[in-house]
């Protein structure tokens, strides 16, 4: 086997000359060590990849970039589409689209353009799965491999101590926490040919804290300059320290609550000092004397309340340490659905002969992780805090408890929580540990900062987890026993539950957030009713975004618009207006009934091809019918049956456009409206199926993928679609198609000759195309709660199943004859079929008044006060029973709240009683 040069370290770009000199000296010591050379050779023999760096199998870009089973908006629209975005011929597009497999069937790990690091991790995980599933006694093999690594690490312990005593700065040598085995890190980096060749030196000499940070090379390269606009070294550190000292003292003594917070910070800091993670207490004068007035810069320590504890953080943003730091790494962290991804890899490796996949997974955590990787100088890891129990200095009069409270300082040999450099420094060490576990233990594991997930077969019990625990202890980054979660079918990783209980029999992994997290989120939403500041809104949006993304589809994301607007506001306001309260009510209902995300591990055993949908819309204000739309559906045949084609053309009811905010152009809203129309029209066709949906409008495509749109009108439609889709469980992949290649462009603009020719060009008998009556989402019920849409979808599917006697998701038995050539298909508007000319804002209002026959109805004042005016119009509405089950009905009298409507808090939310 070809050997790599023995050098384990490479100088940084424009490095410190002392760093280069020390690196060469350390390398000479390693080369002279027989134990080091033997460790490298043993590790090369244990490597399951044997140094191979072959390219991974191709994957579909855009699928699973953020989460498994979730389409990525950026990559899906233009990057490496299933059907090339440059196709301009309808026939060519249909032929290519109907041959495509759904990305969920072709992708396992989640393809995305993340460069060499992602490819390396994918290869390692795949190799670990293939090795472990092909071994006869993997439980014993984990124990053997773990013992080998422990022996190698023990053989290098003395060498690590010698290197540390000879080269490490004093604060690293004197640190009380367990040191990392740098000789072992250097040997494994060499043996496995890992790109982060400077890791051992950073752990030996300490990592740079601020300024121009060198690239770690643990991930792909990306230069990100600091926002400071000047060199960090040129900042007036002395002036900052003077101001911060006085400001901390003023804040700590201004109220009783501030003094209580200061006591909490002191207690947490004291526990770190007792654990040997910090050194203190120091006076400002001591540090000025040690480093010089401008030679150090302090960070303010503050308290952050969490679920069951108070965490202390150090404000590197306020002190401009982060703003003054340039980074050169594109940090990549695993997603919380890692266990589900591994389930797909195991299913792929085992295949149909397995007779069922039985997996378990566990989690581990490194306590005080950042504190255990050394910094190069404590001058910039100095923490300022108000010590409520500071001992009196000579000449000072103590208080009644014998203390003289004042500002004091604590120094850390490791990295503080809050620094940009802390994240890259520690994560590079954690990434190294994950590489070793995958290649030397054959464990399928990955880490999110200091949290690690380990997945394995149930037959192995917790053998891979025990091997991982021993490996981390050998490296010098031991896991915390208090946060150990033994491998089991159900476990939590990064706040998300991965449930394997249905994996063996059904091939399904369920991913969802815990009920405890949802309950806390509902409490936060309830508190927001009384007032919501921009800072609180930012925290709430972050929590909601995380929670909603782990439910099925993108349900609820559009309802975040008012909260996001408050979060982005620069004004100091907390008043909860009607839009905010409506959003809070909607999100509270969603969180209470949040559907779980289900991920198919073995896709479509029957080999069913996906359904294809093309949709389009048109808006011309001066036309006889200003707004029109249509869609074409292709349902591939099964069991020898013929393929089915479904078509629809539709004149948009005037009240639909009139219900939206006035603008000169409505094409964006209409494209979204007619993109979701197929699923409301024939939901039984899409139930439980994989779908490829082509749209010739990039903004509509992006909105449907992300589940969010800045335009309120569009956002309501998108939100209704994703909620409705929870009920029908369609796995929809949206993709862009050029207008010239979109067959749905023909029915939306009355181009019947072109439509018949397009059908005939792909061998479709026009007479067998089934024309359906378009059913739009009820425009006057778009603000209904999510569970109402879910109930409406389930009711529609149940009704369709009773009517046809067939399971949903299957083909229909009936097919309508096509209209005669050149004859326009019957286009029905359930809310009334009138034609109107919308030429101006005034004309639109007058036309709308004539169609709707608007009349104001005086209503009795609400018992709680405040009258309410209503206007009634012909339209559609979502009818809800008191129990929350909904059904879509078309009726006269869909109500809108008039300009004198009372505040939402004075009305009942969530249901419209039948």
Where are these predicted regions, by residue range?
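Catalytic-core region of right-hand nucleic acid polymerases
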Residues: 257-260, 264, 269, 273-427, ...
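Active-site palm subdomain of RNA-directed nucleic acid polymerases
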Residues: 423-468, 678-695, 914
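A short, polar/acidic, helix/strand-boundary loop motif
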Residues: 404-432, 634-673, 699, 708, ...
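RNase H catalytic domain
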Residues: 446, 680-742, 749, 913-914
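Intrinsically disordered, low-complexity regulatory segments at domain boundaries
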Residues: 2-357, 373, 473-478
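Catalytic palm active-site di-aspartate
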Residues: 363-367, 416-418, 440-458, 489-497, ...
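C-terminal reverse transcriptase regions that engage the nucleic-acid substrate
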Residues: 488-602, 745, 824, 833-847
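Polymerase palm active-site segment centered on the conserved acidic dipeptide of motif C
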Residues: 339-344, 363, 444-446, 454-523, ...
């Amino acid at each position: 086997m070809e050997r790599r040069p023995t050098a384990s370290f490479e100088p940084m770009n424009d490095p410190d000359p002392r760093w280069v000199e020390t690196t060469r000296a350390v390398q000479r010591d390693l080369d002279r060590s027989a134990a080091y050379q033997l460790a490298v050779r043993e590790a090369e023999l244990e490597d399951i990849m044997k140094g191979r760096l072959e390219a991974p199998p191709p994957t579909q870009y855009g699928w699973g970039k953020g989460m498994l089973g979730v389409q990525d908006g950026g990559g899906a629209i233009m990057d490496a589409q299933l059907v090339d975005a440059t196709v301009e011929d309808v026939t060519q597009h249909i032929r290519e689209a109907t041959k495509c497999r759904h990305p969920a069937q072709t992708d396992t790990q989640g393809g995305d353009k993340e460069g060499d690091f992602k490819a390396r991790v994918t290869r390692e995980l795949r190799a670990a799965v293939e090795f472990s599933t092909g071994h006869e006694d993997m439980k014993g093999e984990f124990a053997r491999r773990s013992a080998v690594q422990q022996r190698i690490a023990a053989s290098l312990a003395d060498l690590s101590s010698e290197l540390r005593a000879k080269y490490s700065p004093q604060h690293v040598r004197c640190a009380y926490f367990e040191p990392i085995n740098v000789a072992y890190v250097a040997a494994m980096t060499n043996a496995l040919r890992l790109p982060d060749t400077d890791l051992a030196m950073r752990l030996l000499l300490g990592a740079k804290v601020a300024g121009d940070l060198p690239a770690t090379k643990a991930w792909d390269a990306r230069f990100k300059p600091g926002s400071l606009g000047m060199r960090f070294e040129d900042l007036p550190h002395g002036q900052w320290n003077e101001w911060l000292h006085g400001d901390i003292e003023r804040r700590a003594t201004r109220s009783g609550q501030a003094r209580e917070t200061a006591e909490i910070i002191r207690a947490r800091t004291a526990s770190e000092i007792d654990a040997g993670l910090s050194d203190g207490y120091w006076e400002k004068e001591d540090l000025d004397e040690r480093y010089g007035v401008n030679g150090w810069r302090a960070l303010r320590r503050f308290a952050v309340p969490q679920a069951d504890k108070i965490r202390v953080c150090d404000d590197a943003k306020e002190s401009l340490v982060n703003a003054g730091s340039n980074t050169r790494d594109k940090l990549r962290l695993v997603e919380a659905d890692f266990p589900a991804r591994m389930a797909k890899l195991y299913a792929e490796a085992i295949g149909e002969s397995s007779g069922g996949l039985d997996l378990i997974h566990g989690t581990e955590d490194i306590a005080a992780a950042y504190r255990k990787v050394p910094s190069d100088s404590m001058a910039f890891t100095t923490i300022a805090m108000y010590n409520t129990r500071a001992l009196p200095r000579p000449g000072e009069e103590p208080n009644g408890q014998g203390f003289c409270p004042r500002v004091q300082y604590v120094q850390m040999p490791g990295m503080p929580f809050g620094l940009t450099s802390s994240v890259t420094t520690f994560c590079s060490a954690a990434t190294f540990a994950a590489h070793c576990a995958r290649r030397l233990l054959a464990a399928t594991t990955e880490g999110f900062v200091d949290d690690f997930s380990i997945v394995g077969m149930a037959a192995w019990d917790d053998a891979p987890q025990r091997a991982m625990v021993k490996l981390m202890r050998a490296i010098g980054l031991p896991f915390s026993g208090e946060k150990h979660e033994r491998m089991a079918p159900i476990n939590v990783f990064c706040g998300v539950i991965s449930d394997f209980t249905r994996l063996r029999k059904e091939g399904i992994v369920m991913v969802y957030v815990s009920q405890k997290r949802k309950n806390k989120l509902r409490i936060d939403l309830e508190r927001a009713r009384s007032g919501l500041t921009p800072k609180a809104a930012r925290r709430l949006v972050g929590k909601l975004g995380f929670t909603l993304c782990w439910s099925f589809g993108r349900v609820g994301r559009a309802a975040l618009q008012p909260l996001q607007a408050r979060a982005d506001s620069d004004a100091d306001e907390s008043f909860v207006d009607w839009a905010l309260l409506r959003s809070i009510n909607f999100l509270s209902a969603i969180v209470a009934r949040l559907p779980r995300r289900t991920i198919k591990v073995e896709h479509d055993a029957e080999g069913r091809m996906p359904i294809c949908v093309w949709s389009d819309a048109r808006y011309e204000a001066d036309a006889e019918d200003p707004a029109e739309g249509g869609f074409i559906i292709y349902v591939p045949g099964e069991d020898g049956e013929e393929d089915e084609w479904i078509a629809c053309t539709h004149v948009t009811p005037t009240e639909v456009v009139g219900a939206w905010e006035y603008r000169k152009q409505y094409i964006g809203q209409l494209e979204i409206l007619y993109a979701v129309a197929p699923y409301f029209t024939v939901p039984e066709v899409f139930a439980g199926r994989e779908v490829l949906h082509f749209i010739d409008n990039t903004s509509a495509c992006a909105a449907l993928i992300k589940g969010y749109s800045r335009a309120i009108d569009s956002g309501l439609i998108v939100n209704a679609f994703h909620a409705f889709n929870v009920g029908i469980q369609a796995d929809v992949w949206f993709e862009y198609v050029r207008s010239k290649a979109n067959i749905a462009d023909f029915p939306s603009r009355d181009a019947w000759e072109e439509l018949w020719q397009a059908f005939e060009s792909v061998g479709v008998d026009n007479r067998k195309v089934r024309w359906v009556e378009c059913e739009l989402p009820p425009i006057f019920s778009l603000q209904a709660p999510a569970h109402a849409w879910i109930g409406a979808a389930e009711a529609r599917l149940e009704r369709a199943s009773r009517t046809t006697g067939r399971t949903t998701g299957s083909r229909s038995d009936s097919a309508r004859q096509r209209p005669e050539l050149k004859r326009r298909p019957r286009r029905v508007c359930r809310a009334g079929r009138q034609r109107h000319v919308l030429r101006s804002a005034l004309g639109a209002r007058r036309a709308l008044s004539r169609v709707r026959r608007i009349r104001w109805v005086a209503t009795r004042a609400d018992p709680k006060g405040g009258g309410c005016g209503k206007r009634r119009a012909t339209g559609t509405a979502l009818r809800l029973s008191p129990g929350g089950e909904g059904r879509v009905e078309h009726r006269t009298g869909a109500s809108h709240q008039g300009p004198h409507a009372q505040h939402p808090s004075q009305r009942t939310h969530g249901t419209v009683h039948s």
